Amino acid sequence: KKDPANTGDTQKTEDTQKTEKTEQTDPAGKADLAAGDIADNMTSADGKYEIAFVTDVGSLKDQSFNQGTWEGVKKYAYDNDKSYKYYQPANGDKATDDDRFNAMKAAADAGAKIIVCAGFLQETALRKAAETFPEVKFVFIDGYPIGFKNVAPISFQEEQSGYLAGYAAVKE
């Protein structure tokens, strides 16, 4: 492109500028991708997955809890060169504790070192999985401590987001 001052110098295209910026700020050569731009599964050379996500009820791309958690898992795995995969318990919204455990077991059997489980409904299955697979680390999203050293609970005060959203709306 010609520059706006018509000095005859050419300007770099946006793509070239983005590439140069990525090379300068990203020594690993990775672009700063949004989670939605990252593939849904990435295997390691041995075909195993280091990080697994077991969904809560509903679909993976529910534009809510599962999707937000999954996008965070993908982004972390991508940024840290980890392989990853998601598992949905059988029977969808009617999933039982056995269905949830079987999804966690499938993830552990596939080589997952970290399994992220979303939703408080995972607790019973997670207790069984944590005991069955003590070498696997579990992240319990929307859960409370359940007494296992290999389980890291992450809970949040859901009402706070509604309060803050309301406050932000009034302030605008």
Model-predicted segments: where are they?
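A residue-level marker of the well-folded mature domains of exported/periplasmic proteins
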Residues: K1-A5, D9-E172
